[in-house]
Amino acid sequence: MNPNEKISYHIDALFGKGVSSVLPRQLTFSYSRKTGRIKSFGINDQLIGTLRSDGGIALTIFGASILLNESSFKQNCIIPKEEALPFVSEGRSLFCKHVEWFGSNINIGSEAVVIDKSDVVLAVGKSVVSQSQLLGRIGDVAVRVREGIKSRGEQQKP
């Protein structure tokens, strides 16, 4: 099977039908030396995502911002409250009490993209709760953030 088709089918299955339509056709792939399977994919040396062993895709911030151009992808996103924005963008986990809006396509263990109200990607990570479990939990983690737009090393020290 063509690697472009395989990634398109995979993204549509995980994030919703038609989401892969915003992907460019000139994707580059890196393959495993042992198995020959696709490990990751990107555009011009910029990583979009990595295929996980459980069948999911670990998106980068760059990859999430590309997929966010498709309106149906927003159901895989979470919007935090204003007070949590600086912490999440540093790469810290998002707690349930700081969630303002939760997409309907997010399940336990699925890829979650944290965005602000103007649809700018702040962080990407893995969801710990589903939408139905979110309401009763106050001190629990909603998303374990893997990558934020600001790394802690870039911040200035006083």
Residue ranges and their predicted role:
Residues 5-33, 37, 43-108, 112-158:
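Beta-strand/loop-dominated core regions that host nucleotide or nucleotide-derived cofactor-binding catalytic loops
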